[in-house]
Amino acid sequence: PNTSLVTEAGLEIGEMRGIKVNDYLQTSDEHIYAVGDAIEFRHPLTDRPWLNYLAGPANRQARIVADNMVFGNKVTYEGAVGTSIAKIFDMTVAASGLPAKRLKQAGIDYLSATIHSGSHAGYYPDALQMSIKITFSPVNGKLLGAQIVGYNGVDKRIDEFSQVIKHNGTVYDLMALEQAYAPPFSSAKDPVAVAGYVAGNILSGKMKPLYWRELQAADLSKVTLVDVRTPDEFALGALKGAVNIPLDDMRERMKEFPQDKPVYLYCGVGLRGYLASNILLQNGFGEVRNLIGGLKLYKAATAPLPKPKEFSNSGSSSSDSSKVDHSEHSKDSAEAYTIASSVIPSMKAIKVDACGISCPGPIMKLKKSMEELADGERLEIV
């Protein structure tokens, strides 16, 4: 922050190079108060000074200073956990508290959970998935941070996470929150509660998590990697080295799971992998781990980032380090675009709305619609 005037005035600067203030927002000169982006104040979670560039806390600080200047130092400032939100085209991204990167920098132990849940009930029109990641203490489940990427309803969910973090709540408090529910606005199991349930399962030992970085670095010759999705989903793309044993067939195919290796399970978003892990554990298997966030998170996290010059040719890829099999998508994009451009205008479009359908619903609906396509028709899915 620009604190040159403060330095010239002889006021104390903190270790983050912000204006150092006390709980009443007084500077080193008791007659001078300071608020806003240029002050540094201890973070409620780390108890270490930090800079918070947000308008909400700044305005609250101004109210506190006004009260203290008029009535004497009676109101203290408790600090901000840093709740922010931004709109990027049609998407909304939001965060509160400390993400994994900040926790690592601070040397704080943590666990994390990632879910993909609908913005409202799936049977009500226009439900869209949001991805939520929370970080929490492995000791007592204290909620440390939350991040959300989605379309609708991101704002109200991040506000709920923020309140739990601000009041030193735990992932168990997420399960107990009472939200307004009706199908257009939420689900009977709100995404905030679902995040709490997943974190609770990790803490209780009901599910041993497998994080995408661990899977990326794993020696697959020493583990059994199992895709528990349907055969149709598996055929559309799977992780290299995975065998397909659908969740519904597991009990009949139990002998296909080797007992002498750890079993790594994954599905689309994590739910079926969790159910499959319980089946294996109840049948005496030792180390069984479920990929947190499922294939959706793994593909998003390991996809190569395009370079600026590649935006004009999105079909090319400069990296093959991902374990995701992209062989179905390796055709020359320019040729495909030329062919498509010449034939699409004359085709009849069949539109399929798969919004709000939980997996494997969209895949099954797409497959059924493809089977019903007549010659000269094209399929559009949203």
Where are these regions (language model features)?
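Mid-to-C-terminal Rossmann-like scaffold of FAD/NAD(P)H-dependent oxidoreductases
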Residues: 38-152, 183, 187, 191-217, ...
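Short, glycine/acidic-enriched loop or turn micro-motifs at the edges of active sites
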Residues: 40, 230, 249, 356
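Short, surface-exposed connector motifs at secondary-structure boundaries
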Residues: 142, 258-262, 372-379
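A short, polar/charged loop-to-alpha-helix boundary motif
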Residues: 152-170
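Generic hydrophobic alpha-helical segments
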Residues: 161-162, 215, 263, 369
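Domain-level signature for proteins that mediate thiol-based redox and metal-cofactor handling
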Residues: 326-382
